[in-house]
Regions:
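Generic secondary-structure signature for well-ordered alpha-helical cores
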Residues: 15, 35-38, 45, 85-97, ...
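Short beta-strand elements
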Residues: 52-60
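A hydrophobic, small-residue-rich beta->alpha segment in the mid-to-C-terminal subdomain
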Residues: 60-97
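Flexible, glycine/charged-enriched surface loops at secondary-structure junctions
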Residues: 93-107, 124-132
């Protein structure tokens, strides 16, 4: 094609034609927004899968923090709910008294938190974590 509709639809320019004129998608750059799905009149990219992005560590208030996206696109709603449960278990097990979840993520490091959240380690220790004697008290 002279003008690739997928390339035109990509807001971050991850879809580009190479020197041979064939479309390539830079998987490191692509944020999986789905805007390119169904744009080709020749149906080269019609098959898309709906998914969910999960962000952790965000915070509103006086000390705003932007959440960071886990490097996985979840395609199953139950898997997302499990990840939310794991985030709560992570906060309960690794959070310190008076600390917000965003602070916990910053303290243990996003890469470490992501590794833990994408494993089933916390769900296996759920009863133990729920049995912990913890003290809340986060302040704004």
């Amino acid at each position: 094609c002279k003008k690739c509709q997928l390339e035109e639809a990509c807001p971050i320019h991850a879809a580009k034609k190479n020197t041979d004129g064939k479309l390539e998608i830079d998987v490191e750059l692509c944020n999986h927004c789905g805007r390119c799905i169904g744009k080709c009149p020749f149906h080269c990219n019609d098959e898309g899968v709906d998914g969910y992005k999960v962000y952790v560590g965000g915070r509103w208030g006086k000390k705003i923090a932007h959440g960071q996206m886990l490097h996985k696109i979840f395609t199953d709603k139950n898997e997302v709910l499990d990840t939310v449960e794991k985030a709560i278990l992570l906060f309960r097990s690794a959070g310190e008294s008076g600390e917000r979840f965003a602070d916990t993520i910053n303290r243990i490091g996003f890469a470490n938190a992501e590794k833990i959240l994408l494993s089933d380690e916390l769900l296996q220790k759920k009863a133990e974590i729920l049995g912990l004697d913890v003290v809340g008290g986060a302040t704004c």
